[in-house]
Amino acid sequence: MAIADLTLSKSHAGSWRRYYELGKPKVVALILFTALVGMLLSVPGMVPWHTMLFGLLGIGLAAASGAALNHVIDRRIDAVMDRTRNRPLPTGQLETQKALVFAIAMGVVAMGILVLAVNVLTAVLTFFALIGYAVIYTVFLKRTTPQNIVWGGLAGALPPLLGWVAVTGQITVEPLLLVLLIFVWTPPHFWALAIRRREDYARAGIPMLPVTHGVAFTKLQVLLYTLMLLTVSLVPFIIHMTGLIYLVGALALGIGFVFHAYRLWRSPDDRYAMPTFGYSIFYLTAMFALLLVDHYVRMMMA
């Protein structure tokens, strides 16, 4: 009896881990961090705890819902790609119908929380972000154009705006700049990974840029977008949204990103693709942390 109970307990634990994996927790964590920064930058003082709690809960559940829907829609593609073939749906560890119900349930709960406990505008924007990622990007753009990640990246760039609007109820230029920062960051981030995984994408029939236009062209695009990102990152300082701490940090981080992109471009192979991809994650996290540090230092000095 004890052995049977232990086996059942392990089975339940494994099942919950598979549902947890459906939500892409690492991606959701970065989304929540950028949304939190949007919240904290939106006001000079403290954000009301209930707005922060329910705002992040709703945004996080919506992001996890979109991730789970992505698992469901891409299950056949995932099965032929080395990077994704061990996910719960391709391996049969989780039934597609259960995953779909789980994804929809999270989305419904997320919308309910945002409408009832935050504000309608945040709920509407979050809904559009969810549909933009799970439907427009995953179903259409990803499968039809090498510019998929450019236009599809807008949905993934919205979390700072969602956080800002959750607190203020308004759309202003400052959160739109944060959206622009992530929007321009997205192509070099994903294309660096796509260079390394191009054979995977080709096997799955996904028209990622390295598959359709070649590695050399993609490397050049990574460099050009990184230079564009460096320029965009200076705009918050130019419009007096940030101070000198941000300016110095943004320049240092941006030059570091350009260095990685330039090294990738000059390399005769793809050896620097994953280091560039890794730095891109560090860059975005550090940039948003830098925005917070600059914000609170300027508040203390005011």
Swiss-Prot record:
Keywords: Cell inner membrane, Cell membrane, Heme biosynthesis, Membrane, Transferase, Transmembrane, Transmembrane helix. One of its GO terms (molecular function) is protoheme IX farnesyltransferase activity. The chain crosses the membrane at residues 27-47, 53-73, 100-120, 121-141, 149-169, 175-195, 215-235, 237-257, 273-293. It is a multi-pass membrane protein. It is found in: Cell inner membrane. GO terms for cellular component: plasma membrane. Pathway: Porphyrin-containing compound metabolism; heme O biosynthesis; heme O from protoheme: step 1/1. It comes from the Bacteria. InterPro entries: Protohaem_IX_farnesylTrfase, UbiA_prenyltransferase, UbiA_prenylTrfase_CS, UbiA_sf. It catalyses: heme b + (2E,6E)-farnesyl diphosphate + H2O = Fe(II)-heme o + diphosphate. CDD domains: PT_UbiA_Cox10. It holds the Pfam family UbiA. Its EC number is 2.5.1.141. GO terms for biological process: heme O biosynthetic process. It is an enzyme of class 2 (transferase). Converts heme B (protoheme IX) to heme O by substitution of the vinyl group on carbon 2 of heme B porphyrin ring with a hydroxyethyl farnesyl side group. Carbon 2 of the heme B porphyrin ring is defined according to the Fischer nomenclature. Belongs to the UbiA prenyltransferase family. Protoheme IX farnesyltransferase subfamily. This is Protoheme IX farnesyltransferase. It comes from Thioalkalivibrio sulfidiphilus (strain HL-EbGR7).
